[in-house]
Amino acid sequence: MSAIVSEVAVTEKRINHVLVVIAMEAEAAPLLMRLNLSILPSISPSAPCIIYSGLYKDCTVSVVTNGKCGKHGVDNVGTVPASLSTFLAVHQLNPDLIINAGTAGGFQKKGAMIGDSYICSHMANHDRRIPIPGFTDYGTGCYDAYPTPNIILVSMTY
């Protein structure tokens, strides 16, 4: 299946605030330390997500993590905690750019390390198993990623 959106008109706008969404604290820790980000007050008393923020050069950088599961004490992972954390952070911070970062299941066996960056050309869902006839392929899916030639160019020249 091809991407639903092939092109979007992008207006030139200075990016003053970047929000990075990262599910797990261990994934976020190197970025938090490198940028010396400080924890902000809770987004919502009932939401476990945590926001960190600070300045890098002349840009505000915020990181939101999904927080811990109150029952099991592990990092909240998956689409529901990610959606909630992202929504609440966007609502509170109004960022210019949102980056979803993480390992999406991890690639340590393939040599990936925390901090490595990858630009995908395709994506699939590995947490949407739907055992209903006709929904299996939809649930796992295999979709083209939105084309990002400028991001790829920047990452190759960095």
Where do the protein language model's features map onto the residues?
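Mid-sequence, gly/pro-rich, charge-dense loop/helix-turn segments that line enzyme active sites
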Residues: 108-158
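Short, active-site-adjacent cap segments at secondary-structure transitions
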Residues: 27-29, 105-108
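Structural motif
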Residues: 97-99
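N-terminal short beta-loop-beta anion/metal-coordinating cradle
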Residues: 2-88, 92-93
